[in-house]
């Protein structure tokens, strides 16, 4: 995805471009086994070199946003779209610091990114997934309109093993923009 990352605003969140100065916040939020054990591509422990890799290799090749609280500018997580089929299909991924779980932030940010993906980027489909043990992410994905298409085994770096993984999709023809105040 070579398009610039546009800032997105919701009622409570600002989604924006990462900067080098975000490295300490990234490490602080990501260096938590409870976070890393639910993600395929996140190592644990999560060190400064991992945040540098994230900024240099992931943020530069994927459409990735830093998620911050609108009222305090505190970083709470990240969300992004990884291209699968150029200009047609991307994969949605997100993670949040543990202290920010359960507040509806994931749903709020996902709705904003999905809306942009279908309306501005003209994607036809977005895929996503979650480890079956991570029911909270599954709930978020279903809440924003994804439907399960199957299961697979996927690597989990932090756990150093393969885990059962739900595969989901959302097609643009099935997407309904949420009200601006949804969470």
Residue ranges of each PLM-predicted region?
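A short helix-loop-beta-strand connector motif used in the catalytic cores of GNAT acetyltransferases and
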Residues: 55-66
């Amino acid at each position: 995805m070579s398009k610039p990352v546009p800032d997105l605003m919701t009622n409570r969140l600002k989604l924006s471009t990462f900067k080098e100065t975000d490295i300490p916040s990234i490490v602080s939020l990501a260096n938590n086994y409870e976070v890393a054990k639910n993600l395929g591509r996140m190592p644990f422990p999560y060190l400064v070199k991992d945040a540098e890799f994230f900024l240099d290799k992931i943020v530069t090749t994927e459409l990735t946003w830093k998620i911050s609280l609108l009222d305090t500018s505190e970083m709470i997580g990240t969300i992004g779209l990884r291209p699968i089929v150029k200009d047609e299909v991307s994969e949605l991924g997100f993670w949040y610091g543990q202290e920010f779980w359960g507040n509806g932030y994931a749903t709020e940010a996902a709705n904003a990114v999905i809306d942009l993906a279908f309306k501005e980027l003209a994607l036809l489909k977005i895929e996503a997934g979650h480890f079956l043990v991570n029911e909270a992410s599954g709930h978020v994905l279903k809440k924003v309109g994804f439907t399960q298409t199957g299961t697979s085994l996927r690597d989990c770096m932090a756990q150093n093993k393969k885990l059962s993984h739900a595969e989901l999709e959302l097609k643009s023809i099935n997407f309904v923009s949420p009200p601006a105040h949804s969470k």
